[in-house]
Amino acid sequence: MEVENGEGQVQVHLKTKQEQYAVPDVPYAIEGSVSTTELNIFLNALLQNKGAESVDFDFLVFDEYLRGRLCDHLREKAISFEDSIEIEYVERFPAPEPQDCLLHDDWVSAVKASGKWILTGCYDNTLNIWTYKGKHKLTIPGHTAPIKAVDWISLDNENGRFVSTSQDQTAMMWQWNIASNAVECVSVCKGHERGVDSVCVSPDAQRFATGSWDTMLKIWSAELEDAGESTAKRAKESGVRTPRMTLQGHRESISAVQWMDNNTLLTGSWDHTLKVWDLNLEGIKTEISTNKSIFDASHSKLNNLIVTASADKNLRLYDARTNQGSVVRSTYLGHNAWVQTVMWSITEEFLFVSGAYDNQNKLWDCRSPKAPLYDLLGHGEKVLDIDWSNPKYIVSGGADNTVRVFKSSKATVENMETK
């Protein structure tokens, strides 16, 4: 049998966890040269016998998406062509559709969605609030240098609270009255000695963390009255807030910070390391060494994996739970320039998005390292930040002075997590 050359047949079993698309569990003889296209035709022919409509599927062979010929995939995995091969098929995630373009006056370096709103930060030192359909609600001055990161603290029908960080070495906390569309700065957070590149609010919205070019990780109260500080009265009177905790350990800029739970933080740095911090112990719990500067990192609560963005065009997957944490689980190839930003889906266990200096966003499945699921096109210059906090929308900001909004048709309202 000449299956090694793509000629000849392979015995396969077709499996799925989506029972509505299940086919009889019997061996099927298929050509070794088949790709996803031929497998879709074959599978849909089987399903039509059950009266089902045509559906697009992706195929997992030994835990990785099939992206070429089956025989080439098996050869790469060193699998014998004489074995019976199990192929798992899943309904293909639908392509997100471009919905809107939000035009700003300068580079958009920070984006964060929550509820009905998109919060943006720009290189003209301003914050902006928008709807997903492009209605501009508010421009907020206050910082004295470009904005680098933003996050929502809380949001309801009446008020929104959020935090922004800047190259002006500060973080600023804001309160927005939605009905009157009025905003005020409630605290200026001082303590960093260089620009503040990253910020993240804790899951319980009690604290937020910042990472800076001064290599320090700082923890701040996110409450309106910082009663836990000995200097609370002075801080309240002056509007200046000081950090609750300062953690030292990185050797270069902290480019990414994310809460894994209310007492555990993930940071990524230009010093080529990821660190997991235990705030109860005020120290480092786990360190993952990489071979590239980390521009962004994202941890998934659904699968406990970490994906990183780096200067060498690649994204990498790590597992912080194992003793081999520094071992790269997968490398994702597809961007043609620095990858600046990355974020996991909060509802889809295997999906994440990235944005890069090649002007492109990409939607990935972590089981498909050789190619993204989709290219999300629209930016005319490099992408600086991407956000998928609202499962219904992927939003990104870029050096073309725009925010691009892509609508995901698969998102379910009941899965949405809005603060």
From Swiss-Prot:
UniProt repeat feature WD, residue ranges: 103-140, 142-184, 191-230, 249-287, 289-328, 334-374, 378-416
Family: Belongs to the WD repeat WDR12/YTM1 family.
Pfam families for this protein: NLE, WD40
Domain of life: Eukaryota
Tagged with keyword rRNA processing: yes
Predominant place of localization: nucleus
Region (Ubiquitin-like (UBL) domain): 10-91
Protein's name according to its UniProt entry: Ribosome biogenesis protein WDR12 homolog
GO molecular function: ribonucleoprotein complex binding
Biological function: Required for maturation of ribosomal RNAs and formation of the large ribosomal subunit.
Protein localization: Nucleus, Nucleolus; Nucleus, Nucleoplasm
Keyword field: Nucleus, Repeat, Ribosome biogenesis, rRNA processing, WD repeat
CDD domains xref list: WD40 (cd00200)
InterPro entries reported in the protein's UniProt record: G-protein_beta_WD-40_rep, NLE, WD40/YVTN_repeat-like_dom_sf, WD40_repeat_CS, WD40_repeat_dom_sf, WD40_rpt, WDR12/Ytm1
Gene Ontology cellular-component annotations: nucleoplasm; PeBoW complex; preribosome, large subunit precursor
GO biological process, one term: maturation of 5.8S rRNA from tricistronic rRNA transcript (SSU-rRNA, 5.8S rRNA, LSU-rRNA)
Source organism of the structure: Drosophila mojavensis
